[in-house]
Each structure stands twice: as C-alpha cells, then as structure tokens.
C-alpha cells in the first residue's frame, strides 16, 4: 500500500499544480510543451483543470487496486502513467522535461510497485 500512497500523493501534487495553472499561475513553461511561457490561455486552462481531475482519477484507481479492488483500472492508470512519462521525456520544453520527467518516473515506478505487490 505504501507504493500506492506514494503514487496517489504525487497525483495530488500534480493535480494541485494543474489547478494553479487553471487559476492563472504563470508556469506555462513547465507544462504543455512550454508553448505558453507564462499564463496559459483560457482554452489551455480548461485542459489544465481536466488534467487535474484525470490525475485524481488515476490516483484513486491505483489506490483501489492496491486495496484489493479490481486491478483493471489500476493497470490502465499505470499504462497511462507510462505514456505521460514518455511525453515528458520528449517534451520540447526543457523546464517540463527537468521537472516532470523525474516526477513521472517515480510515479510510474510506484504504480508498477503497487500493482505488482
């Protein structure tokens, strides 16, 4: 369960970052490929809040699977986390790569640990 809680905690951290973007934090260079270096435009803010909700759902899926629930949502979350990790690794934004590649790598490791435990 420790790995699942690590994963879920990092999902909450990521969701909090996305909510801050939605509210106008000038951190655009750290997300969405760095296309908007400061405040995201309205359309992209909507994407940020959707991402926040998505991250919370991923965290809940892995927690549920680790607590004896059906494993399918947890494995889907793990696979999606792997895709997110790859997206961060190849991001054109060096800021996004530097911050989110290591975070998503830890998330992927924690999700795999939780699902294989």
Where are these regions (language model features)?
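Feature marks short, highly hydrophobic, charge-poor N-terminal signal-anchor/signal peptide-like helices
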Residues: 1-6, 117
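N-terminal signal-anchor transmembrane alpha helix
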Residues: 6-20
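Interfacial loop at the N-terminal end of multi-pass membrane proteins
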Residues: 24-48
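Non-cytosolic membrane-interface motifs at loop->transmembrane helix junctions
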Residues: 34-35, 69-73, 95-104
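Core segments of transmembrane alpha-helices
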Residues: 45-62, 82, 104-105
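Mid-chain, well-packed structural core segment of small domains
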Residues: 57-88
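Juxtamembrane boundary at the C-terminal end of a transmembrane helix
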Residues: 64-65, 111-117
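Membrane-helix boundary connector in multi-pass membrane proteins
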Residues: 83-99, 115-116
């Amino acid at each position: 369960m420790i790995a699942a809680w690590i994963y879920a905690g990092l999902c909450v951290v990521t969701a909090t970052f996305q909510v801050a973007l939605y509210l106008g934090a000038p951190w655009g260079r750290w997300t969405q490929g760095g296309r908007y270096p400061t405040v995201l435009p309205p359309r992209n803010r909507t994407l940020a809040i959707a991402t926040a909700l998505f991250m919370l759902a991923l965290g809940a899926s892995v927690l549920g699977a680790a607590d004896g629930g059906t494993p399918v949502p947890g494995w889907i979350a793990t696979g999606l986390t792997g895709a997110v990790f790859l997206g961060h690794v190849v991001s054109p934004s060096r800021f996004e790569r530097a911050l989110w590649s290591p975070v998503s790598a830890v998330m992927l490791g924690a999700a795999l640990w939780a699902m294989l435990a």
